[in-house]
């Protein structure tokens, strides 16, 4: 599903990031983290999986805000405030991205997100928002079903 999404959206990358716990702070509270678990990249585009493993979620607050907005509207990286997430995207040559939450089987909890990234202004300029939004939502349903089947 990721490769089909990436190709149909003419993106550089399509990814699944999943939220999890890992470790504890000094006061005993669990550290919320995320890891990139699945990635499809256009030929010649570098994978980012290694740099997105076991990442502390609070370092990516702007990403989390975008995910919880629940609408996969493409966003220009340059429109983000100066933050760790923006620097991370820029370091990976991302000029535009789209995020949509992935929910658990009951639909109550956000367990991760589906991401598309464009690394070329020419590709980003050609994106039609009205095409990307339903495409992301459709693929999210397949991915949610697949992840739910893995936990049962």
Give the positions of each predicted feature:
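Generic "edge-of-domain/loop-turn" microfeature
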Residues: 23, 43, 104-107, 121-123
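General structural signal for secondary-structure boundaries
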Residues: 1, 52-57, 81, 122-130
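Conserved beta-strand segments of the P-loop GTPase G domain that flank and frequently precede/overlap
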Residues: 76, 99, 117
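Juxtadomain coupling helices with adjacent low-complexity linkers
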Residues: 110-152
């Amino acid at each position: 599903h990721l490769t089909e999404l990436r190709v149909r959206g003419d993106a550089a990358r399509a990814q699944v990031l999943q939220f999890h716990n890992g470790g504890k702070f000094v006061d005993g509270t669990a550290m919320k983290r995320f890891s990139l678990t699945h990635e499809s990249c256009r030929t010649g585009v570098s994978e980012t999986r290694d740099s997105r493993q076991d990442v502390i979620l609070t370092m990516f607050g702007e990403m989390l805000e975008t995910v919880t907005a629940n609408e996969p509207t493409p966003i220009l990286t340059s429109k983000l405030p100066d933050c760790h997430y923006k620097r991370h995207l820029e370091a990976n040559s991302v000029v535009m991205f789209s995020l949509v939450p992935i929910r658990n089987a009951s639909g109550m909890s956000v367990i991760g997100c589906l991401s598309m990234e464009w690394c070329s202004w020419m590709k980003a300029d050609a994106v039609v928002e009205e095409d990307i939004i339903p495409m992301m939502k459709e693929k999210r349903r397949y991915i949610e079903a697949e992840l739910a089947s893995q936990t049962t």
